[in-house]
Amino acid sequence: MKQKVAVLGPGSWGTALAQVLAENGHEVCIWGNKPEQIDEINTKHTNKHYLPELILPTSIQATTDLATALVDVDAVLFVVPTKAIRSVAQEVAQHLKTKPIIIHASKGLEQGTHKRISEVIAEEIPAEKRQGIVVLSGPSHAEEVAVHDITTITAASENLADAVYVQELFMNDYFRIYTNDDVIGVETGAALKNIIALGAGAIHGLGFGDNAKAAIMTRGLAEISRLGVAMGANPLTFIGLSGVGDLIVTCTSVHSRNWRAGNLLGKGHKLDEVLENMGMIVEGVSTTKAAYELAQQLEVEMPITETIYNVLYNDEDVQQAAKEIMLRDGKTENEFTLDF
């Protein structure tokens, strides 16, 4: 059944998801706050800054007016930076006339509160103005989705029927969705993998080989699982698409902003230079701070996250940081046991 979807955020991922929805026959309106970008989408059907080669379906409309984007919508898809989630959700709540499903595909933790994105949205959009909230996450580069490369991700909601709705909304012959009811696990994996990707990029920038890259990914996954379980997640989620799947794709590809930023840090560039060079939001930088603070609060050991925090915020030398983490006291590998 044809649905009307408002896509909030015309970045690379928002644009790619809008394309999927339009190609599936849905009515799509993209909202953004840059008039020149919105005009480009409407008149040229391109978004050159983010996806230079993509020609968008002509059925996609775009607007800078949020109220217009939200008229008669069946679903609202948030794809804005984590730092903008609360303010955009507040605005959305003012304009909603229908009770749409809320979907978000952003990855991070809110600064200061350390809250997951679905928690922030739930606080700002009252239950009487919406249906459930669904998290869309997994191993997915926008650049590959835009050219129809096969991609599989997860739709997670406490209400599985809402996750199934999103599954049916997006699925086609190149974009497959699996459902999950572990919202905490899916959101935690989505946010924290960006931290580990910064480290993986730094490892590459320092000139280390595959052994080191494998080490940071596997021990990074242990940290993600450790914090996630402390927050109430199912540990099995972290060996799925939104856990190890997203970690692999983010830690091994030049498409990953966080990997590229880490690579520059490993080559000796300062954080300010790196962010200026990137020209796009690098979610892992702010997420590192939030995760470090949350780990302290929950008394969860996260040595890789702590090391990356010190590099980013205490100006610790990357080479020295790599040595220090290797010289920590010995540990056991297995932390969780599963009863079958």
Swiss-Prot record:
Domain of life of the organism encoding this protein: Bacteria
EC number(s) per entry: 1.1.1.94
Keywords: Cytoplasm, Lipid biosynthesis, Lipid metabolism, NAD, NADP, Nucleotide-binding, Oxidoreductase, Phospholipid biosynthesis, Phospholipid metabolism
GO MF term list: glycerol-3-phosphate dehydrogenase [NAD(P)+] activity; NAD binding
Annotated GO biological process: carbohydrate metabolic process; glycerol-3-phosphate biosynthetic process; glycerol-3-phosphate catabolic process; glycerophospholipid metabolic process; phospholipid biosynthetic process
Residues at which sn-glycerol 3-phosphate binds: 107, 138, 140, 193, 246, 256-258
Active site, per annotation: 193 (proton acceptor)
UniProt xrefs under InterPro entries: 6-PGluconate_DH-like_C_sf (IPR008927), 6PGD_dom2 (IPR013328), G3P_DH_NAD-dep (IPR006168), G3P_DH_NAD-dep_C (IPR006109), G3P_DH_NAD-dep_N (IPR011128), NAD(P)-bd_dom_sf (IPR036291)
The keyword Cytoplasm is assigned to this record: yes
Annotated localization: Cytoplasm
Pathway the protein contributes to: Membrane lipid metabolism; glycerophospholipid metabolism
Similarity annotation: Belongs to the NAD-dependent glycerol-3-phosphate dehydrogenase family.
PANTHER family: GLYCEROL-3-PHOSPHATE DEHYDROGENASE, GLYCEROL-3-PHOSPHATE DEHYDROGENASE [NAD(+)] 2, CHLOROPLASTIC
Record-given protein name: Glycerol-3-phosphate dehydrogenase [NAD(P)+]
Source organism: Enterococcus faecalis (strain ATCC 700802 / V583)
GN (gene name): gpsA
